[in-house]
Swiss-Prot record:
Family under the similarity heading: Belongs to the peptidase M20A family. ArgE subfamily.
Gene that this polypeptide is encoded by: argE
Protein name as catalogued: Acetylornithine deacetylase
NCBIfam families: AcOrn-deacetyl, PRK05111.1
Taxonomic classification: Bacteria, Pseudomonadati, Pseudomonadota, Gammaproteobacteria, Enterobacterales
Reactions catalysed: N(2)-acetyl-L-ornithine + H2O = L-ornithine + acetate
Predominant subcellular localization, coarse grouping: cytoplasm
Length: 383
């Protein structure tokens, strides 16, 4: 059956040639069904059982779980099937044609992160899955680049509890064991419009927002003082005021003002805790002006993530790579997979190539990535 599997570079080429863009804008958003079908067929050829899971609340998106072996525990290798949209004017190559040049493989998703599945499939050619002592799972998720709906839904619904997981995001093969989360909110204040010549007849939303911002900045200072995680370059939760808009004319009392902000929490801080801190900070404004201030999510929140530094997964991977685990500031699906089992983020390619025109993966990653995948499968599924 394994001889039906195409060569490594042809698998890679087919993955890149199959569009699977995720976007909040419906006109740009694409189903990942064709890519899931490709992966499902290849893993079936390798003797895996394959389950395709529709993801609710998405535009025809799917997860795929390929599994082999019996019993509890085992290893989960995970990644997302979607890419970001691309700016055609900034690409000098066809994003959907895998192009090799000067030691680099170019194409949309080469690094972030369709290519990881090509590495898994290629490594499995030489693995007799019938002899595994523990199960091996391959998870391909949907919509990581927007809502992370695929990983969220899988984590909420699966009964699987592997011993550990590796998510193959581009980390330049440097293992990552922790990252911050991301919460984004819209603060909206509804005032009362009126002519600027008679301020008493209106409620100026900009003035109320000025008051609210003062309390939010106090929260920012408090977060910096109360929470600390030395391993991060910025070792405290950050709070950013990113966008504000209010009013429509200089001679009108502003009736509405909206502020967009984000918080990047440290691992261990819960979403409920952060929501409570924000609501407490804004309580004086809400109490003084009942019904005029609302807080809404801009995007589904992502908690911080941490794999215990003394876990066997960390020790094994650090020994195999000869490198210590790191912490990073960007977000992945790890917080959701971590609810199932200890998880590391580790994969070929550089995060600096993610979301960039002329995205590429350096060919120097091919051999060590294949070896690493083979080694972790041997360690966690054969021992």
């Amino acid at each position: 059956m394994k001889n039906k599997l195409p060569p490594f570079i042809e698998i890679y080429r087919a993955l890149i040639a199959t569009p699977s863009i995720s976007a909040t804008e419906e006109a740009l958003d694409q189903s990942n069904a064709d890519l899931i079908t490709l992966l499902a067929d290849w893993f079936k050829n390798l003797g895996f059982n394959v389950e395709v899971q529709p993801v609710p609340g998405t535009r025809n998106k799917f997860n795929m779980l390929a599994s082999t072996g019996q019993g509890a525990g085992g290893l989960l290798l995970a990644g997302h099937t979607d890419t970001v949209p691309f700016d055609d004017g900034r690409w000098t190559r066809d994003p959907f044609t895998l192009t090799e040049h000067d030691g680099k493989l170019y194409g949309l998703g080469t690094a972030d992160m369709k290519g990881f599945f090509a590495f898994i499939l290629d490594a499995l050619r030489d693995v007799d899955v019938t002899k595994l002592k523990k199960p091996l799972y391959i998870l391909a998720t949907a919509d990581e680049e927007t809502s992370m709906a695929g990983a969220r839904y899988f984590a909420e619904t699966t009964a699987l509890r592997p011993d550990c997981a590796i998510i193959g995001e581009p980390t330049s093969l440097q293992p990552v064991r922790a990252h911050k989360g991301h919460i984004s909110n819209a603060i909206r204040i509804q005032g009362q419009s009126g002519h600027s010549s008679d301020p008493a007849r209106g409620v100026n939303a900009i003035e109320l927002m000025h008051d609210a911002i003062g309390h939010i900045l106090q929260l920012r200072d408090s977060l910096k003082e109360r929470y600390h995680y030395e391993a991060f370059t910025v070792p405290y939760p950050t709070l950013n005021l990113g966008h504000i808009h209010g009013g429509d004319a200089s001679n009108r009392i502003c009736a509405c003002c909206e502020l967009h902000m984000d918080i990047r929490p440290l691992p261990g801080m819960t979403l409920n805790e952060l929501n409570g801190l924000l609501n407490d900070a804004l309580a004086p404004v809400s109490e003084r002006w009942p019904g005029r201030l609302t807080v809404d999510e801009l995007h589904p929140p992502i908690p911080g993530y941490e794999c215990p530094p003394n876990h066997q997964l960390v020790e094994v991977v650090e020994k195999l790579l000869g490198a210590k685990t790191e912490v990073v500031n960007y977000c992945t699906e790890a917080p959701f997979i971590q609810t199932l089992c200890p998880t590391l983020v580790l994969g070929p390619g550089s995060i600096n190539q993610a979301h960039q025109p002329d995205e590429y993966l350096e060919t120097r990653f091919i051999k060590p990535t294949r070896e690493l995948i083979t080694q972790v499968i041997h360690h966690f599924c054969w021992h």
